[in-house]
Amino acid sequence: MSPEKAVLDIQGQFRVYTEFYHTDAAAKTIILVNGSLATTASFAQTVRNLYPTFNVVLYDQPYSGRSKPHNVHGAPLTREEEGQLLLELIDHFNAEHVLSFSWGGAATLVALAHQPRRIESAVISSFSPVINGPMREYLDKGLDYLGAHSRYDMGHLINNTIGKHLPSLFKRVNYRHVSSLDGHEYDQMHYHFSQVLELDPDNYLTAGKRIKVPVLFINGAWDEYTSANDAAQFSRYLQNCSFNTIEATGHFLDMEHKAACRDSKQALMNFLQPAHTSSSVYNRVQGHHAFAF
């Protein structure tokens, strides 16, 4: 299962590393949008859940992963810029579906509000329009650690909060990833955190009024940071949305344990292919994974 790899020029502004898992047997293509400072490796298990039923597209943001060496790192990217970049990739790969994780939901909502012609449906996982108490505490501490480029503290903060339900192996890999980031990546993450804290939640919700395609929101029952109850507020504004809560699971969903992987896959397939039935087998993914929010 080897993807086609490429570095794409996006309107002369950015160069973006992509991986395209393609098979002639798949009729539809889905593009995956990762969380803040996560990389294509973060979606290793999700790719296994979706491919070869779908063609799957992964990409690294210009400031991270394998896109990083191909770009000049000046001002942080805004969620609007990330949304526009996603629209360009949707057009390039002729994608019919989008699946986002965590902060990737912000860029995905921006893109969907532009009503891209090809998109038929979207899945937004581990995302909420509400900054509740636990999330605010996490963001406030994160701002301090990121501003000081305190790698040790930031790595432990993520593992002790949104990542607390991850297996110990993934926590170790997560810590190594977060603690080895470049300074501009910490600055980008600091900007993300600031944006989340300063943004009026109605901004997300109002944008939802312009989204016409079906959207599924998936949250973990144990995720107190982007909770299922908070995500349900999207129902006030989106014309066609549904919700699925993965039991006994936190923020990282299919990465956390076998049952979460099985239930996450089933939720995806029931939504993307309502008639689809499958028996899922959890595959512990070996190698390097980057899981940062």
What is each model feature region?
Residues 222-226:
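Acidic catalytic loop of the alpha/beta-hydrolase fold
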Residues 249-262:
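Catalytic histidine-centered segment of alpha/beta-hydrolase-like enzymes
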Residues 113, 121-150:
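Flexible "cap/lid" loop of the alpha/beta hydrolase fold
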Residues 58-99, 263:
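Active-site loop/oxyanion-hole signature of alpha/beta-hydrolase fold enzymes
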Residues 211, 217-219:
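Short beta-strand/loop motif that positions the catalytic acidic residue
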Residues 100-104, 108:
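Gly/Ala-rich beta-loop-alpha elbow adjacent to hydrolase catalytic centers
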Residues 14-69:
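Conserved HGGG/HGGXW glycine-rich cap/lid loop of the alpha/beta-hydrolase fold
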Residues 133-135, 153-208:
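Conserved alpha/beta-hydrolase catalytic His-Asp/Glu region
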